[in-house]
Amino acid sequence: MVKQERKIQTSSTKKEMPLSSSPSSSSSSSSSSSSSSCKNKNKKSKIKKYKGVRMRSWGSWVSEIRAPNQKTRIWLGSYSTAEAAARAYDVALLCLKGPQANLNFPTSSSSHHLLDNLLDENTLLSPKSIQRVAAQAANSFNHFAPTSSAVSSPSDHDHHHDDGMQSLMGSFVDNHVSLMDSTSSWYDDHNGMFLFDNGAPFNYSPQLNSTTMLDEYFYEDADIPLWSFN
């Protein structure tokens, strides 16, 4: 009888052991999932956010801006870095709003070069001209950005970038980029043409890099809220 009771007690303890170990295994799995979620949140928080810029699922950065008082969004391009996309947005915003624009890089003197060379308070660029200026400004930023093999101070980088932007904007003046008065109609929706301030048609189609302009140049969308101009 004693031997049978001992066997019964031993078998019962063996059955109870997995039940006692289950809470620890569940707690370890929950802790691992929480730690992974924390890591993902930390990665997202480390990414600097710029106005007019969003990241796509495959890692590229896109920029677009809404034309004031219109349903039109102007596509500014797809870039390898958030900074380049933010530069494109800044230049486009300067074209639309002038000196009062709230920029991603307000301390950059290249913004003032743009205003001095192209803009005044009463002029606006056509949508595709804005696309071209923004894309070339972003490409200029990438061209003058320091590489890992070259060591330079931030002031040196700003100096080279400003020189590049100054040269870039000067080339647009030399090529007679169309400027139009803000009171005139700058785009004819019916005929798909841009207009000079005297109403003459202007079919502007710059040859942009296909890797930069991946989507439609601009498109209509009244319901989706876009980035604030303030």
Swiss-Prot record:
The keyword Transcription regulation applies. This is Ethylene-responsive transcription factor ERF012. Keywords: Activator, DNA-binding, Ethylene signaling pathway, Nucleus, Stress response, Transcription, Transcription regulation. It is found in: Nucleus. Residues 1-51 are annotated as: Disordered. CDD domains: AP2. The keyword Mitochondrion does not apply. Expressed cotyledons, ovules and seeds of immature siliques. Residues 1-17 have a biased composition (Basic and acidic residues). SMART domains: AP2. Residues 49-106 bind DNA. Residues 40-51 have a biased composition (Basic residues). Induction: Induced by jasmonate (JA) and ethylene. Down-regulated by freezing and heat stresses.
